[in-house]
Amino acid sequence: MQQYSCKYNKQAILLVNLGTPDNYDTKSIKRYLKEFLSDPRVIEANPVLWKIILNLIILPIRAKKNVHTYKTVWNKQHNKSPLLFYTENLADKLDKKLDNYIVDYAMRYGNPSIESKIKSLQDQGATEIIIFPLYPQYSATTTATVYDEVYRVLSKLRWQPTIKGINPYYDNKFHIQTISQQIKEHLKKLDSTPDTVLFSFHGLPKEYFDKGDPYYCHCYKTYRLVKEELQNEYPNIDFELSFQSRFGPKKWLEPYTTVKLEEFTKQNKSVVVIAPGFSADCLETLEELAISEKENFIKKGGKEFSLIPCLNDSNQHVDMLYNIIDEEICLKK
């Protein structure tokens, strides 16, 4: 009987982030937004009606409008979006730290796709792939759709790798400690203590929460646990929670970040903003918060505005992910 050699017996870790256009031109942005906004997990609407609205109204307007915003934040030195740049570096650093695992990354929307990276990992000999969605707080619009895509890809494979998943880490001790330390380090750099630290999370239609999405609860717990870590050391700082990036006419989770910042201007408060729901800086942090919200805050008479960068590809982020993975699956040393 003919013998076949089998060299495949490796483990891999696949970091997954949201996604990005390939470039900041209208065509690239339109292609990315179409894939993103066509996901029924993201937009829960009548599919026929939504397809008409998306293709005839939203895509032509938003793609053109977003050229300037993407161009503003684009990493022109590497010709990549910040999200792609930081996620790629993060995976590379984690790969160097984990000798017994292949570490790679994918984007849920855009490139590199989950499908292409699962194929690549299999070609490298991976028979077990650990999926790590880089969303601390679970939502059907983020974490769930990652697994939807993973299993869609698996359904087409003759030889399916074993799949394991890392749990949402919104209340993980390593995550809470890392975010808390990040805030402390930022506060030390300031000339004066701010009146408020605002935790700004990406918003979600309230209807999704009413249907059972736990996202709000996860955001609130992250906020509460970090607040408990810091409030004794900073008794004169108010810690508050808000939600940004509202899209469409429906009611979203409140309070809205824009509204909270307007309140702070009227109260003559200085504010430090952190966006702990984002693993890497992106359009929502670098343009929406750092530029648009800050300009509006200052224009309306706000006192001082400071934004804490996301964890990005920092060593603290690498160590945090390493510890979370080790806690979940007991890494081979």
Swiss-Prot record:
Gene3D superfamilies: 3.40.50.1400. One of its GO terms (molecular function) is ferrochelatase activity. GO terms for cellular component: cytoplasm. Signal peptide: none annotated. It comes from Francisella tularensis subsp. tularensis (strain SCHU S4 / Schu 4). It is found in: Cytoplasm. Transmembrane segments: none annotated. The keyword Ubl conjugation does not apply. SUPFAM superfamilies: Chelatase (SSF53800). It is an enzyme of class 4 (lyase). Its main location: cytoplasm. Pathway: Porphyrin-containing compound metabolism; protoheme biosynthesis; protoheme from protoporphyrin-IX: step 1/1. CDD domains: Ferrochelatase_C (cd00419), Ferrochelatase_N (cd03411). Belongs to the ferrochelatase family. Keywords: Cytoplasm, Heme biosynthesis, Iron, Lyase, Metal-binding, Porphyrin biosynthesis. InterPro entries: Ferrochelatase (IPR001015), Ferrochelatase_AS (IPR019772), Ferrochelatase_C (IPR033644), Ferrochelatase_N (IPR033659). This is Ferrochelatase. Catalyzes the ferrous insertion into protoporphyrin IX. Its EC number is 4.98.1.1. Pfam families: Ferrochelatase (PF00762). One of its GO terms (biological process) is heme biosynthetic process. It catalyses: heme b + 2 H(+) = protoporphyrin IX + Fe(2+). Fe cation binds at residues 202, 284.
